[in-house]
Amino acid sequence: MLTPVRCRTVPNATVATAARVLRRANLFSRYPRQLGHLRWDSTIAQVLERKGLGVPSTARHNEIGVQQLSEHLYKQLFPRGNTDPPAPELIELAKDHLARHDLLGKTTDKTPPIAFQLPALVGDTLDEHFHKLGVDAAEPFLTHAKQFADAHLPPKPTSWVRRSGWTKYNRDGTTENDVLPQGNMMCFDVEVMYKDNPYAVMACAGTPDAWYAWLSPWLLGETENKAQLVPMGDPTVDRIIVGHNIGYDRAKILEEYDLKQTRNFFLDTMSLHVAVNGMCSQQRPTWMKHKKARELREKAEHESASVELQEVLQGGSLTAEEADLWVDKSSINSLRDVAQFHLNVKIDKDIRDVFAETDRNVILNQLDDLLTYCAADVQVTHQVYQVVFPNFLGVCPHPVSFAALRHLASVILPVNKTWDTYIETAEATYLQMLHGVQERLFTLMERTLDYKADPEKYLSDPWLSQLDWSGQEIKMAKPKKKGDVERPALNQKLPGYPQWYKDLFVKVPKELSGLDEPDKEQENRKARHEFINLTVRSRIAPLLLKLSWEGYPLFWSDQFGWTFQVPREKAETFIQRQMTPVQFEDPDVDDRLRMDVDHKYFKLPHKDGPNARCVNPMAKGYLPYFEKGILSSEYPYAKEALEMNASCSYWISARERIKNQMVVYEDQLPPSQRFVNKDADSNTPIGGFVLPQVIPMGTITRRAVERTWLTASNAKKNRVGSELKAMVRAPPGYVFVGADVDSEELWIASVVGDATFKLHGGNAIGFMTLEGTKSQGTDLHSRTASILGITRNDAKVFNYGRIYGAGLKFASQLLRQFNPSLTEAETTAIATKLYDATKGAKTNRKSLYKRPFWRGGTESFVFNMLEEFAEQERPRTPVLGAGITEALMSRWVSKGGFLTSRINWAIQSSGVDYLHLLIIAMDYLTRRFNLACRLAITVHDEIRYLAEEPDKYRVAMALQIANLWTRVMFAQQVGIQDLPQSCAFFSAVDIDHVLRKEVDMDCITPSNPIPIAHGESIDIFQILEKGDDAKLDDSIVPQSQYAPRLENIPYTPRVPVMQRLRERAEAGDHQAFLRFIRAQITNSDEELKRIIAETRYSDPYGAFSLASNGRVSGNPHQRHAAVHASTKTAAAPSKPSIASRFDSVSQASRIKSVAAGSDEPTIRATKAQGKAMAKASGTKLAASTKDTVLNVTIKKKVAAPEMAAVPSTSSESKSKASATTSTTTTENATASPSSSSNVDAKKTTSKTKPTHKKETEGEPFPSLDDPVIAARLEAVSKTSPGTRASVAAKLDALASFSMRAAAAAEAAVTTTTTPEPPTNPPPVAPKAKEPTTTMAEKVLKPTAVPKNPTPTLTPTTKKSNPTSTPTTPKPVGRPRTTPILPYTAPKKKLPSSAFSKEQKEPMSVSEAVWTASVGGRATTTTATATATGDEKKKTTTTPSWKPVKESLFGRGVYIP
């Protein structure tokens, strides 16, 4: 064992400096040592000043060099140690896999070991720890929630009291005024006049004891202040509040606008439904079609449907969707549809339209009906809750999954009066930029309008000729009297102007719509500008700007969108570049383009592929084409207009949602809920709150959803209003403390792949995630960028899309966006190269695995495991065991259906598990150490807490510990009892006074030119240096009211999801599992064939072990790096290679096969010869092992028996077999010390007629053990390595032919052979010692005796054991010592005579050997003799077979 070397004292030295000093002084060694499942690489002690929290410790590295947790942390997090280390063969396979991708040994993490005292775990494992933390955080809310699901609401009131505030309606019909809702559970709903203001005008709450109704004082005319919030009572009471989309209702509750979190638990039935019966975006269109079809059928059933409708219903066109069984297992999320799905109840929502009114008197006139409608929603919501909540607990059984919802549903964002300034500035900036571009467009419009009197000019212009110039005629009124001057007719819209100009007006004032006087035309045209709807998004804008694609004018097609016109002689260039040509076949549209025979038209590229239409070439997605000159204009300010459109795109899309945010300022709140410090500067803006209306589980992956804050972009210099997040400001005395989980979902995917090897970094993507660097180009994004020839930043889109299940088509389309000049063939080739390098090749080999699998790529293991998750009957996440929605279960979808969504679910839902664990860990640490903080918001992999200034470093430490616990939980649940140090902690914790992505972002935008002061970012080393300011002291006594109570929480260990999958994959055959891993590693077809051959022909009992050279014995892969085993350790025994065993088996099998038709003594003699030959071969192979077999040789003193091998049509072969006597003697050479006895010499007598000269001479079949053949092969193999394998294959083919021919002949021989009665019982060979038993002997032993065994015709001198019973051969224990040679099964067609009658296809060599040894799988014909021998009869016996799962060769066989 390596003794840790402690650092010398290095005053004022950093950790890195200390490490360099030690290396130069040679105070520790870098040589790896084999010790258990870890190698202790270096033993640097961390050098920190004693005022810090760090302590000295030892660095630990795993078997492939990835740095793990320090010894100090490891002992705290894994008190039991590594109870399930990776097997040596898995380590070797991982090294082989990494070496093939040029990753082995390229470890880069050189950080010193991190060590400090952690809060004690509550239990021995993280699973027990988090179970107890989850139960503690969930109670008493979980108990209340279960009780409320079993309870029933009282009947709804039949009449309502018109009184502001709360009114209680008792069961007996009495009412009480000004009584707040009581109890620990309620169902709640509010109604809002949403077009007038965002505040509630009425609310209803139902409890098991009573009903409550609330009316706004403003609604009843008691005040003109519309900002009325609903009070709910004491915020310290533990209470569950159930509602459908409860986040919307929560924003109307008074007590929620407080820095201190209430004890309310908001349970959203919409979220519960989505988690249990939600649908993915791909399913929604099909479901909507099904819904429409169902509504039509119901309409036809209840009404007298029209003939056309009946024909549609009877025509079967509506039943296509019904084939999708999942349709009946899901619904969309509205309360109406959810109630119909779960309760089969239809809700009338028509009266809801009344709330669209802006006059409160309209509401008052129907107040009773509206209150009844509101109460009905409450009642239905509770009924839905009674169904979905128990189902949710079944789908997401872990207490953490429930407890985390309380915090996710109670997020809060503090703001101040700068919020109003932000909206005003952003809107003004947008209007100013819009006005500037519009002025230029108006100028172009006026310039174009000047051509109305010159048709030659506008018809010859390819852009202007597309405009509709008709409608310029002026209708004249008939003169009333003869001789009167004609006057223009009245009520004409802009007479004298072309139609395209008229279409720009929605409405024209009457004074500007008439005929212009010549001297006032320009003045009137300018006055009309304010009524013209002309922006860069208008259809006419690209024509006014005269846009071109590579110099060719743009043309609008009603059928295909924007296209560009190319002369027909130049069209071939664009066709070769895979631009999409269009054919105008519809006679009703695009007449002009269809008649143009001189040009060819091509669609503008679109990000969604060639089938999508481009409807606006001025969209921000086309800005890169402008910058590259592909898209151009005759006017220089066309690019400016495009940039303006891109700059304002965010504000245009989000302005309404941002303006409609419900901000409640503190001057609207009670004094106890205001947060301005008394010592604050008088200039401090008034503060307020925004409660994001979050749906805690808004997608099938259980991700939170919110329209504004969870989709807000980061501040960009060219985007108006993109500083939105920075407008969230911490109140005085508070800060935001948070972090981004580094590559959260990428790490989850990689650790799922690492689980195959039980080793962090064991698969390529895992290694790149942990150890890859941008500088060396070994990280995932750099590898992808180099393959695609794009930037590293752009490569992230490809990587995450692929991890989420996106296919080759997605990569091709995305690549075209980054490089439009590529042809479709080029993009497909590059994308294919990427997927070959990452996902690998798709392979379907049932002999290796039950379903198709990926192999040879850096991510093959990940995708195989993700698809394994997706294909389960009830898929569950690997950590918390959360189930998939019922609509995506495999039983309800077609095979392979929605596979992308199911793979995406496995990753993203695991990411949600990560977030939930992090939140519950923080909840525990907050209550245990009295931290003054609460969750502010989470955005996927970002988490931000609002903390008091004095506690900011302690909260930062708590975040690091929570993250460490969460990562270890993931590692343990996937089967790896360790954690890399590089991912154990957040790379940085941000401490900031505003909400933004990075603390050093200035957040300068067109609407915010003033930079925002930077925040603070600290890593784990800096936190440790803070000392007591960051210490979570165990001596702190938690507040009694909220202290964790973990002592009496029961815990039952559960079987991890990954363990179940692994056990199912191994299915009791570890060697088959290892072969499957090797198949996933290889990208070579030839190597795959060798693995398949090994699967078919090798015994399934062999085991990999470390040989003396440090390699896995028998592994067919070329080793790239050896395991550095200690030289003092004896080499583990190894098995003979498959090819060598083939040689031994083939020799004995051939002798067995040609002996068919001979008498039993001859068969025994040939068996003995075969065993001796096999032993001789096995001795050579096992010479270097501990258990050496007997060195047996064959001496040719007597010629071998002469046997008839294959029946033929010649007269010689048809003659009866005659007897000749031959004696075969086998002797033992000098035996090894471990041998206890020699092999007895065997003498047998046989009579047969010679049929072949070669066999008469006693020459055996050619064998690889023949010295002459071996010497020749050795010479040839130096120049042709595959020669030996080829020869072995041919010899096996010969053996297969002879054995099958013999099987056919055996039946004929047994019908003509007259056996003699036995004089002694059948002999039983003495049990040989296991170390001296060869594979050939095991194969040639019968596994069972038929019901009517053939009697032995000649007595032998062998001892018999009458009590012995036939047993199934046991596995040979000797492991391999030589590598497996390449082997390809012969595919030559054998003659029909080589098959038995029942056999439908040729047998493999392994089946032939088995057939020769145990009697095969066909009906057997045996000769039975009477006891006296006087009467001879032939009987045909069909044994009663029973199946056995796996035979010696992995095939199902049958035994009697």
Curated annotation (Swiss-Prot):
Cofactor(s) this protein cannot do without: Mg(2+)
Family: Belongs to the DNA polymerase type-A family.
EC number: 2.7.7.7
The species this protein was found in: Neurospora crassa (strain ATCC 24698 / 74-OR23-1A / CBS 708.71 / DSM 1257 / FGSC 987)
Gene Ontology MF annotations: 3'-5' exonuclease activity; DNA binding; DNA-directed DNA polymerase activity
InterPro entries, alphabetized: DNA-dir_DNA_pol_A_CS, DNA-dir_DNA_pol_A_mt, DNA-dir_DNA_pol_A_palm_dom, DNA/RNA_pol_sf, DNApol_Exo, POLG_palm_dom, RNaseH-like_sf
Assigned GO CC terms: gamma DNA polymerase complex; mitochondrion
Residue stretch of the organelle transit peptide: 1-41
Example GO BP: mitochondrial DNA replication
Additional free-text comment from the UniProt record: In eukaryotes there are five DNA polymerases: alpha, beta, gamma, delta, and epsilon which are responsible for different reactions of DNA synthesis.
Keyword Nucleotide-binding among record annotations: no
Record's function text: Involved in the replication of mitochondrial DNA.
Keywords, comma-separated and alphabetical: DNA replication, DNA-binding, DNA-directed DNA polymerase, Magnesium, Mitochondrion, Nucleotidyltransferase, Transferase, Transit peptide
Main location: mitochondrion
Protein name: DNA polymerase gamma, mitochondrial
